[in-house]
Amino acid sequence: MAATDVDIFSNEEKRNLSLGGHVGFDSLPDQLVSKSVTQGFCFNILCVGETGIGKSTLMNTLFNTMFENEEASHYQNGVYLRPRTYDLQESNVHLKLTIVDTVGFGDQINKEESYKPIVDYIDTQFENYLQEELKVKRSLFNYHDTRIHICLYFISPTGHSLKSLDLVTMKKLDSKVNIIPIIAKADTISKSELHKFKIKIMSELVSNGVQIYQFPTDDEAVTEINSSMNAHLPFAVVGSVEEVKVGNKTVRARQYPWGVVQVENESHCDFVKLREMLIRVNMEDLREQTHARHYELYRRCKLEEMGFKDTDPDSQPFSLQETYEAKRKEFLGDLQKKEEEMRQMFVNKVKETEAELKEKERELHEKFEQLKRMHQEEKRKVEEKRRELEEEMNAFNRRKVAAETLSLSQPLKKDKDKKN
């Protein structure tokens, strides 16, 4: 079908037809539910906050279980992220939960780059998913999605204002992940201070342009509850897995000399609000927002870096095939250019090597001639010495013969004199 036919067909007025009998596609929601239950779900939580602020305790409280917790020291050289994955089941629903802890966050004297390991970790999970998506033979159905769906940002209950580290970190993260700020250990400040602290936090977030996750209000089923919960941000929470008896009931609470703070009592803290909003009402929206907003932004930026765009410089539609051909042509041009540069470089290198070899050959020849002349000079000197030595030997032999002749002639002369 031609493109024009598709355009004409898409612009036609849609008609509502009545069915003459039962067809069966009304079971599609049931099919989707059955498939989802069989496949299971994954949910990934990033907990950002200082050491000892109560991140692990809150996770245990949220999911009503005891996760593996390792005590973290306040003397870390830097920030590193520690992911832990657990398989949970509630009724017949399976959930693969990953909790990522930021170990050492806020413990260094120089906190200027404390956010970088967190940003790098989030980008790495996006990159892993993108690489799987770009494979020719991909398997997203079985792929363990590690993209962060929610960042719970734990704010210290100072009662005054946000720390610079908090503002910088949330600003760096707000375009990459859904952020829900929460005031940790909210039972350490009074209700009046807590109310003022919440207002101060939201004011500072707005003035610094930090975008936090807003519970969606476009779905009529959750519009009312989400609208009211947006007004309670940031949530002031208290975590505890200890059970305390209050009256005739046993509740999760924190026991103090002055009284008991009940975790699930909404007049004491916002824990129930956080749990409802995070898990019961908006968990799927957080997953969708991660994929449709944050991951798509990362994917678009990456593809644009690679040269893939939806429009050409004249803002005309540009298909993937055209982009591929343009990139292929550009790549081949660059390849030919580099081949020519390498060939020219090789030729120049060969010429330089030949010149160096010729120079070495000339130097060796000159050295050989010099050695040859030196050898001839030494040979001449040796020959001259030999001749001198032979002449001296001949002269010596002559003197020797003369001396022997003289010594023989002396006795004969004496005998002759005696006879006379």
Swiss-Prot record:
Record-linked CDD domains: CDC_Septin
Positions of region (G1 motif): 49-56
GO molecular function: GTP binding; GTPase activity; molecular adaptor activity
Gene Ontology cellular component annotations, sorted alphabetically: cell division site; microtubule cytoskeleton; septin complex; septin ring
Domain Septin-type G as annotated: residue spans: 39-305
SUPFAM superfamilies the UniProt entry points to: P-loop containing nucleoside triphosphate hydrolases
UniProt key word Nucleotide-binding: yes
Domain of life: Eukaryota
Identification of the protein by name: Septin-8-A
Organism of provenance: Danio rerio (Zebrafish)
Lineage: Eukaryota, Metazoa, Chordata, Craniata, Vertebrata
Gene, per the UniProt record: sept8a
